[in-house]
Amino acid sequence: MAALQEVLLAVLLWPVLVTISNPINCGDEQSSLSNCLSISEEKLLDRESFSTLSSSIVFLKNHVLCLRRCLSHSQYSSRQARQENACMTKVLPIPSSKSEIQQITDKWLLHAVLMLVQSWIKPLVYLQTTMVRYDYASDVLLNKTKWVLEKLISLEQGVVILIKKILNEAVMTTTVSELDLFPTDLQPDILESVMNDYSLLSCFKKDARKIEILLKLLKCRRNDMYNCA
């Protein structure tokens, strides 16, 4: 139980997991937790991970908003109405009452989190690619976009570990191809692209909040399901 709680805590604190340049390999049944997650005690106790993610998304949104304002204001105004409501996040009911939390399963929670995480990896790869095209995009903005993408991929790896540990299931991580990194269908209209990026970040922030809630529910259920609310 102690080892499992360590894994749960590590996933909740996913920014300190190994990055995409050092993928996790926990396929061996004999692999210990320490082999799967190389993490110091100080980082393990860092409880600011999700607030860091949230603030990073807000940072990106604010900077993309600045990019929009750098472009023609009249052009933006003519398109704003149809773009602001373009958010399409995953329809996923979040259990809220004590009875709902008791009725769901760990499997449902884990696969719901994995679905949300994997649905955003390629859109964020695309976002990183489009950011490079903006004349007004600073190095800080580009680095922050890369950071968010890397942490999302680390989170996916952490959830895969949990599924292996708790459900004894093997699942595949997302494969990012060269076409994803350098898409050929980039929109020639920079204004449209900036507005799409802003809408994408708005959607991602909503789903990131869902991911945080579901992982906290999972941790709570594993500790004391009948008093979890």
From Swiss-Prot:
Q: Could you give a single Gene Ontology term from the biological process aspect?
A: positive regulation of growth
Q: Can you list the disulfide-bonded cysteine pairs?
A: 26-36, 87-203, 220-228
State its location(s).
Answer: Secreted
Determine the domain of life of the protein's source.
Answer: Eukaryota
Coiled coil ranges (UniProt) are: none
Q: Which family does it belong to?
A: Belongs to the somatotropin/prolactin family.
Protein name, entry field: Somatolactin
Ranked from the top, the taxonomy reads: Eukaryota, Metazoa, Chordata, Craniata, Vertebrata
